[in-house]
Amino acid sequence: MNKIRKGDRVIVRTGKDKGKQGTVLAVLGEHVTVEGVNVAKKHVRPNPMLGTTGGVVDKVMPIHISNVALVDANGKPSRVGIKVENGVKTRVLKTTGAAVGA
């Protein structure tokens, strides 16, 4: 069971975007892409076959999953634990003890 999933609200703990919050767009193995975090400029060549124009495009790049933490209701970073009740695993915030997601 992954501790961080698509749609979770996270905060960046280290790096150039430290302190920024965003929503997880995708989980790619040990990397995640977070909305508005680690944005790079990519040069795109025009492709008349696809009807795309060339230019400089902002692209969200992945960051390592260890550099982000879930945000609790108070806006503080929190670690995630897994609790088993009646054979069902649920993710739980360590700071508040509240269940994460549905």
Swiss-Prot record:
HAMAP family: Ribosomal_uL24_B
Gene Ontology CC annotations of this record: ribonucleoprotein complex; ribosome
Assigned protein family: Belongs to the universal ribosomal protein uL24 family.
UniProtKB keywords: Ribonucleoprotein, Ribosomal protein, RNA-binding, rRNA-binding
A Gene Ontology molecular function term of the record: structural constituent of ribosome
Nucleotide-binding listed as a keyword: no
Pfam families in the record: KOW (PF00467), ribosomal_L24 (PF17136)
Matching NCBIfam families: rplX_bact
Matching CDD domains: KOW_RPL26
Function: One of two assembly initiator proteins, it binds directly to the 5'-end of the 23S rRNA, where it nucleates assembly of the 50S subunit.
Classification via SUPFAM superfamilies: Translation proteins SH3-like domain
Classification via Gene3D superfamilies: 2.30.30.30
Segments forming a coiled coil: none
Protein name: Large ribosomal subunit protein uL24
